[in-house]
Swiss-Prot record:
EC number per UniProt: 2.1.1.182
Originating organism: Haemophilus influenzae (strain ATCC 51907 / DSM 11121 / KW20 / Rd)
SUPFAM superfamilies: S-adenosyl-L-methionine-dependent methyltransferases
UniProt gene name: rsmA
Stored PANTHER family: DIMETHYLADENOSINE TRANSFERASE, DIMETHYLADENOSINE TRANSFERASE-RELATED
Catalytic activity: adenosine(1518)/adenosine(1519) in 16S rRNA + 4 S-adenosyl-L-methionine = N(6)-dimethyladenosine(1518)/N(6)-dimethyladenosine(1519) in 16S rRNA + 4 S-adenosyl-L-homocysteine + 4 H(+)
Sorted UniProt keywords: Cytoplasm, Methyltransferase, RNA-binding, rRNA processing, S-adenosyl-L-methionine, Transferase
GO cellular component: cytosol
Protein name, UniProt field: Ribosomal RNA small subunit methyltransferase A
């Protein structure tokens, strides 16, 4: 029976809750994070504390961001960690990680945020995009995600998994798969396989762009029409002559270009923006 109740709490579908309970998987994740006593760690979606407890035992202090009111209250009264925990009851999608970095004076301490969590799969992609905005104040991130999302994060050009999420993630971070996790490690068991990924923000961006909007825009337009040649998919942004001058094969498709190519296209658009552009539009995060 795949019960939705675990440790007295019923998983809430609207929060995408699946609670990790497999001890060997938990140990593997904690070993990958390798928390140290004086570091500033932030857990997103601590849930019932499967990762909170073993990490909390190894550090001096742990900040957790939890949207579920009942779970946040449980953590505030945790039997042996409550004095170590700062519980922030809010939506991680709206949370200002930069303000936390400033509030804790981490720059003066020579530290950055170390972020980890078992992310709700229904918001994992937009949450990743939110976190990338704070790449300069984050030391590293370790996340449990849907296995297919991890494949996309780690993908190389010329593969089916390669897409906008790949480019945006690898633009900001070095991305490494850590371990795969079966559905049986959770309660209730999800219908998909999971995996843990490590993201380490680049100290210096290898392919900096002048305006991130244009990197998002060109990737969205290319991958939303990934079966088309770039000559056709990007026709509203570039003439064939422009693409050729930028070293782009007109018959190539979205997955054939490296991050450096997309950065070059984005920088050209920053200098030569189309007249009818609306930079306030919301870019589609799907591919």
């Amino acid at each position: 029976m795949n019960s939705k109740k675990h440790l007295g709490h019923t998983a809430r579908k609207r929060f995408g809750q699946n609670f990790l309970h497999d001890t060997s998987v938990i140990q593997g994740i904690v070993a990958a994070i390798y928390p140290q006593p004086n570091q500033f760690l932030v857990e997103i979606g601590p849930g019932l504390g499967a990762l909170t407890e073993p990490v909390g035992e190894l550090v001096d202090h742990l900040t957790v961001v939890e949207l579920d009111r009942d779970l946040a209250e449980r953590l505030r009264h945790h039997p042996f960690l409550h004095q170590k925990l700062t519980v922030i009851e809010t939506d991680a999608m709206q949370f200002d990680f930069g303000a936390l970095y400033t509030k804790e004076n981490l720059a003066e301490k020579g530290q950055k945020l170390r972020v980890f969590g078992n992310l709700p799969y229904n918001i994992s992609t937009p949450l990743m995009f939110h976190l990338f905005k704070y790449h300069d104040v984050i030391q590293d991130m370790h996340f449990m995600l849907q296995k297919e999302v991890v494949k996309r994060l780690c993908a190389a050009p010329n593969s089916k998994a390669y897409g906008r999420l790949t480019i945006m993630a690898q633009y900001f971070c070095q991305v490494m798969p850590v371990l795969e996790v079966p559905p049986s490690a959770f309660k209730p068991a999800p219908k998909v396989d999971s995996a843990v990924v490590r993201l380490i923000p680049h100290k210096e961006l290898p392919h900096p762009v002048k305006d991130l909007y244009w990197l998002n825009r060109v990737c969205s337009q290319a991958f939303n029409q990934r079966r088309k040649t770039l000559r056709n998919a990007l026709s509203t942004l570039f003439s064939p002559e422009n693409l050729t001058a930028l070293g782009i094969d007109l018959n190539a498709r979205a997955e054939n270009l490296a991050i450096a190519d997309y950065a070059r296209l984005a920088n050209w658009l920053a200098d030569n923006p189309p007249a009818d552009v609306n930079k306030d539009e919301i870019l589609d995060s799907e591919e």
